[in-house]
């Protein structure tokens, strides 16, 4: 019974998590499609025409951190490939700059620059990159999985990994609990859902270009539940096969590529991971930061300049590498900061405004969304209270249980949205009289 129960949890985890992600993306996506505005402008409906700048800056700061983290991840794949050369390996081991090896710094700057080349040509180039990057990554992943399965002597979901090894790996990843247990799987699912916290907020940056509501749902269906579940299966098969071949649990593509005898397979793995990471980085972080920063200073900073500022901040963060350490802890801590914002925006759009937004007033500093001097006090209070429980207490104090931080984003959404709903009921918005 226990084995069946555990297996059912393993089966349900990617399905349930991907459906939650799909649902949340649709909620934000529909708002973007209907209003035709990006996240910083949509936020004006709930935060006020000036208060939205606060929401935009929070998202921009998070985007800069993620931009640096994803760039570092992609450059790590390059490093794993380069150190196969004895001279480069020696350079990697003996040269240190800015708290990193010289090779790591060079690879980081190269990946950082490559992203700028893609981005500086505008959103159409970003779209074309995504069009070919997605299929290319899938083809490479399948080749990698098939190659490892052949080398392992067959395909199997029976991993045969010792429990002590699994315990070490889950602890390294920042996930508590015994592998396969209910609470460990819950933590993995929560981290997976939280991973998309930044994109939930700014998905309307992309959905505003959709033809209709159905197009948003169809695109999300194929891109999220279908793609996520299939990709999880392939990744799982690859990890199991790699364990059977190399006797180690290798969680990162660059770790697998470092084991290959073939330069061709190593290059394929490195390029696959780099292309996939760059695709995520450009869409989820660069575009968002560019829109957010340019929205705060629209007269001085356009989309491209906003993106360049975000890229420079990510470059400046590299010596400090705040993303190094437990991946799950980083995802949950940084994602939690955006929970209250999402809760407030969704509650305002669907429960307070009932989906009826005066788009013209979003661009009028003296219009319906001026609130108190351009700031909606209800949203500010809800953000503050939500942030206390989602970010401040779990990350900077020991007042809450250790497990709380894993679900910080969820608490942020619920508490931030709940407080906003109560305050909007007690202090309904007042529409300024026409001048």
Predicted feature locations:
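Single conserved hydrophobic/aromatic residue that forms the stacking wall/gate
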Residues: 1-11
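Selective recognition of specific alpha-helical transmembrane segments in multi-pass small-molecule
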Residues: 16-24, 58-70, 135-151, 191-198, ...
């Amino acid at each position: 019974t226990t084995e069946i129960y555990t297996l059912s949890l393993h089966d349900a985890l990617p399905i349930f998590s991907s459906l939650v992600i799909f649902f949340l993306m649709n909620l934000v996506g529909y708002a973007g499609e209907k209003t035709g505005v990006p996240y910083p402008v949509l936020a004006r409906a709930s935060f006020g025409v000036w208060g939205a700048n606060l929401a935009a800056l929070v998202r921009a700061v998070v985007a800069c951190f993620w931009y640096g983290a994803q760039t570092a991840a992609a450059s790590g794949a390059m490093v794993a490939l380069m150190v196969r050369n004895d001279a480069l390996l020696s350079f990697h081991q003996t040269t240190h700059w800015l708290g990193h090896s010289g090779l790591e710094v060079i690879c980081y700057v190269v990946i950082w620059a490559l992203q700028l080349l893609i981005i500086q040509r505008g959103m159409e180039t970003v779209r074309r990159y995504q069009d070919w990057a997605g299929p290319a990554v899938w083809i490479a992943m399948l080749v990698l999985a098939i190659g490892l399965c052949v080398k392992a002597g067959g395909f199997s979901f029976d991993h045969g990994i010792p429990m002590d090894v699994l315990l070490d790996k889950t602890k390294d990843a920042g996930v508590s609990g015994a592998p396969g247990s209910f609470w460990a799987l819950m933590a993995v699912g929560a981290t997976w859902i939280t991973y998309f916290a930044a994109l939930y907020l700014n998905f309307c940056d992309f959905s505003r270009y959709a033809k209709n509501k159905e197009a948003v749902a169809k695109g999300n269906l194929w891109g999220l539940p279908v793609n996520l579940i299939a990709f999880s299966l392939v990744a799982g098969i690859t990890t199991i096969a790699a364990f059977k071949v190399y006797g180690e649990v290798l969680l990162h593509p660059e770790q697998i590529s470092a084991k290959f005898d073939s330069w061709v397979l190593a290059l394929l793995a490195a390029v696959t991971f780099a292309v996939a990471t760059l695709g995520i980085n450009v869409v989820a972080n660069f575009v968002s930061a560019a829109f957010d920063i340019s929205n705060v200073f629209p007269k001085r900073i356009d989309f491209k300049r906003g993106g360049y500022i975000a890229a420079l901040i990510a470059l400046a963060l590299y010596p400090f590498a705040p993303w190094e350490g437990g991946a799950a802890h980083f995802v949950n801590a940084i994602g939690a900061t955006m929970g209250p914002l999402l809760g407030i925006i969704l509650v305002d759009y669907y429960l307070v405004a009932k989906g009826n937004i005066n788009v013209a007033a979003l661009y009028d500093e003296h219009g319906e969304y001026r609130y108190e001097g351009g700031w909606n006090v209800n949203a500010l209070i809800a953000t503050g209270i939500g942030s206390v429980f989602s970010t401040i207490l779990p990350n900077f104090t020991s007042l809450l249980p250790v497990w709380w931080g894993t679900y910080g984003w969820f608490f942020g959404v619920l508490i931030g949205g709940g407080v906003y709903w109560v305050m909007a009921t007690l202090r309904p918005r007042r529409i300024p009289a026409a001048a």
